[in-house]
Amino acid sequence: MKKRILLLAGGQSEEHEVSLRSARSVLAALPRDQFDVTPVVISPQGRWLPPTDTQRALETGEAVRGGDLVLHRAASAEGYDAVFPLLHGPMGEDGTIQGLLTLAGIPFVGSGVLGSAVSMDKVMTKQVLASVGMPQVAWRLAVRREWQERPQEVRARAGELGYPLFVKPANLGSSVGISKVSGPGELERALDLAFSLGRRVILEAMTAHKPRELEVGILGNDAPIASPVGELRFEADFYDYETKYTEGRATMHIPAPLPPEIAERVRMLALTAFRTLDCAGLARVDFFYVEQTGELFLNEVNTMPGFTTTSMYPKLFEAAGLSYSELVTRLVELALERR
């Protein structure tokens, strides 16, 4: 008997359109002899769209208005065997939709409330992973009220790290709101931007040399496996939003040309991060590798990475011998297995 799958896409984050592209790929890849798939697009306003508007959004990529409030439509997930929440960023990848589905008792692809929420928040990720000795660059936390009332304290923290440094909102994805700050004169503008997007901000030291950006895919629940290591190459100072989503600005190299011992260490660190954060199903774990010194630093853990057929995560497992269709099928199996 076919399994009934509810595929959620769109959402309220900056990655709404990326999610729609991923959903089109997954929708085409799930074997029709095994699954009966119903897509539902969530609008940027948080509304669950009816079938005709969902189809239009998937075909055109346009941000459609209208639809029902999420709680009014949550009951519509009843009767499905599993949900594939192909949502990125806040209100999709941060434990919110996972909490709703958990309350409803419906299995879903990906990490649960804890793994999703902690991995989405850069501060919590760093603090939890520090407890297991995960290598990370030096960083400091600042909150909006401190910046408004005691800006000299925030400036002092930046001075402790030294310049240049990065300023990042603590709980946004897709490189939104990130600034490279070359000196004290650029700090105010960067902090104002980051605090306009959230109340908590991370100040993060830069590595001594421009690092290579390495990525590893993780697949599984309590016995996860790691993919080969991939590398992103680009000319920009860092992997910002424009570089990430402008075709031709970055290239993928799978497997990354690395000494075998470095590649194996990256994979082992990625598995440690996945287990420590209590992730499930899938994740893409990103690292900085400073070739000149041999240093590795964990950058972030992405619990619902981009999922088009040309995205890094599926390409990593394709290199391991798992086709795109086999990968999405396995993710649904893992969702059903976990509960």
Swiss-Prot record:
Which of this chain's residues are annotated to bind Mg(2+) 1?
A: D286, E300
So what EC number does this one have?
Answer: 6.3.2.4
Which EC main class describes this enzyme?
A: ligase
Domain ATP-grasp, first and last residues per copy? 126-333
Q: Where does Mg(2+) 2 bind?
A: E300, N302
Q: Where is the signal peptide?
A: none
Q: What are the entry keywords?
A: ATP-binding, Cell shape, Cell wall biogenesis/degradation, Cytoplasm, Ligase, Magnesium, Manganese, Metal-binding, Nucleotide-binding, Peptidoglycan synthesis
Q: Which GO BP terms sit in this record?
A: cell wall organization; peptidoglycan biosynthetic process; regulation of cell shape
- Extract the PANTHER family matched here: D-ALANINE--D-ALANINE LIGASE (PTHR23132), D-ALANINE--D-ALANINE LIGASE A (PTHR23132:SF25)
Q: What does this protein do?
A: Cell wall formation.
UniProt protein name = D-alanine--D-alanine ligase
Source organism of this protein record: Deinococcus geothermalis (strain DSM 11300 / CIP 105573 / AG-3a)
Report the gene name.
ddl
